[in-house]
Amino acid sequence: MKYADIDRIYRNVPLDRIPWNNETPPDQLVELVETGKIQPCRAIDLGCGAGNYAIYLAVHGFDVTGVDSSPAAITIAAENARKHNVICRFITADLLGDLHEIPGRFGFAFDWELLHHIFPEDREKYVQNVSKILTSGAWYLSMCFAETDPQFGGTGKFRTTPIGTTLYFSSESELRELFSPLFIIHDLQTIEVGGRFGSHRAVYVLSRRR
C-alpha cells in the first residue's frame, strides 16, 4: 500500500470521483447490523476513508473509531460526522505499524475494500494487528476484490486502476489460509458488490477472533 498515493487522492480528487467512496453502507454490513447478528459495541472501521460506514454504525448505537492512513481522509471523515451530528473518533495510523495510536480493544472490526490495497508480503502483519485490537470472540468482517473480478483488465493478481492505485486480487483459498490461524471463519464466499463505477466480484469473509 502506498500511503502517499491514497492521501494524494483524498487531497486532490473530488469525493464523488473516488471509486471506493460510497455514502451508502454495503448491504452485507446493513444485514449484520439490522438483523442483530452484530450487536452495538466498540467498533473499528479500518481504512475508514470519508467515514461513511463509521457514521452508519454510530447512528445504530455503536461506539465507533475510524482509522485511515490518510490525514486528508481523516479530516474529511471528522467533518462528515459533524454534518451528520454523530460522535465518532477518527485517527490517522499506519495499519501495518504498532497501532499505538489506537486505544483499547473492540468487539467488531471491519475493512471494506481495504485488503486489496495491502500486498501479500504485508497481509500477515495486518491480520495480526487486527487480532491484537479485538477482544476474544469479536467479529471481523473483511471484503476485498476477487481474482475472478472482470474489472481493471480482468486478469492478473496485480492490477492498476484508472485512479492510479495498484491492487492485489485474492482467491478464496488465499484468504482462508490468511485468516484461519487467528480467526474462526463463519462465512467465506465470492459475492457481487456494487461500486460507484460498476459492480465487482469480491471475496467476503466473516469471522470471529480466536
Predicted regions and their residues:
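A conserved beta-strand element that flanks and buttresses the S-adenosyl-L-methionine
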Residues: 110
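Class I (Rossmann-like) S-adenosyl-L-methionine-dependent methyltransferase catalytic domain
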Residues: 1-44, 50-102, 118-129, 139-210
